[in-house]
């Protein structure tokens, strides 16, 4: 890949607005934030979680009674980072409407299901995947044992929340998350991860 192509991949479109006082340029994500739209694109990690949490809190302070739209296209990532987003979504006053555009896997699917009931959507050709928590403990046997216990506790916690959010029996969620469980948008609706599959805006 050429240097030019690499640079182009990192480019963020700018939007220019004109007013009586002149012109002002925004990056596209800042402009959409003005419309109460937040994007989660790519891996869930501490950096992306901090950005999403900050945007959620900012939009709540702007208007605690107006919904926030949360667009997700993510393969998942860190459980602790994802739980920071999840807890903030439940903590703030505005309803958070979620929409999968592309792929929502692992923590991405978990956050998709975390939206306000009745306001969780998927575009028709999106894919959703759930699975169990991944661990990568190394070190002394005692340390590995401590991490293993924590992973099992986290797995139980996430399965319980997913069961509550989807309406599925906990035993079914446990069985389905043992391995990668892929769903189409319609299958995710049947499962209870989303409430509606939409092809066009209402």
Swiss-Prot record:
It catalyses: Hydrolysis of proteins to small peptides in the presence of ATP and magnesium. alpha-casein is the usual test substrate. In the absence of ATP, only oligopeptides shorter than five residues are hydrolyzed (such as succinyl-Leu-Tyr-|-NHMec, and Leu-Tyr-Leu-|-Tyr-Trp, in which cleavage of the -Tyr-|-Leu- and -Tyr-|-Trp bonds also occurs). Its EC number is 3.4.21.92. Keywords: Cytoplasm, Hydrolase, Protease, Serine protease. The active site is at residues 106, 131. InterPro entries: ClpP, ClpP/crotonase-like_dom_sf, ClpP/TepA. Pfam families: CLP_protease. One of its GO terms (molecular function) is ATPase binding. It comes from the Bacteria. GO terms for cellular component: cytoplasm; endopeptidase Clp complex. It is found in: Cytoplasm. GO terms for biological process: protein quality control for misfolded or incompletely synthesized proteins. It is an enzyme of class 3 (hydrolase). Its main location: cytoplasm. PANTHER family: ATP-DEPENDENT CLP PROTEASE PROTEOLYTIC SUBUNIT (PTHR10381:SF70). Belongs to the peptidase S14 family. Cleaves peptides in various proteins in a process that requires ATP hydrolysis. Has a chymotrypsin-like activity. Plays a major role in the degradation of misfolded proteins. Fourteen ClpP subunits assemble into 2 heptameric rings which stack back to back to give a disk-like structure with a central cavity, resembling the structure of eukaryotic proteasomes. This is ATP-dependent Clp protease proteolytic subunit. It comes from Acidovorax sp. (strain JS42). The gene is clpP.
């Amino acid at each position: 890949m050429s240097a030019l192509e690499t640079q182009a991949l990192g480019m963020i479109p700018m939007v220019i607005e004109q007013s009586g006082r002149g012109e002002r340029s925004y990056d596209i994500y800042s402009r959409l934030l003005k419309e109460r739209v937040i994007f989660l694109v790519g891996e869930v990690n501490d950096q992306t979680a901090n950005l999403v949490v900050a945007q959620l809190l900012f939009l709540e302070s702007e208007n605690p009674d107006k919904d926030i739209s949360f667009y997700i296209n993510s393969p998942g990532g860190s459980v602790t980072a994802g739980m920071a987003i999840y807890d903030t979504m439940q903590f703030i006053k505005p309803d958070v409407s979620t929409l999968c555009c592309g792929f929502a896997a692992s923590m991405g699917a978990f956050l998709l299901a975390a939206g306000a009931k009745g306001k969780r959507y998927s575009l028709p050709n999106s894919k959703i995947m759930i699975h169990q928590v991944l661990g990568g403990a190394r070190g002394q046997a005692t340390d590995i044992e401590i991490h293993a216990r924590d992973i099992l506790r986290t797995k139980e916690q996430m399965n319980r929340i997913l069961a509550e959010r989807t309406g599925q029996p906990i035993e079914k969620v446990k069985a389905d998350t043992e391995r990668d469980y892929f769903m189409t948008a319609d299958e995710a609706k049947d499962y209870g991860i989303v409430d509606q599959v939409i092809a066009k805006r209402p």
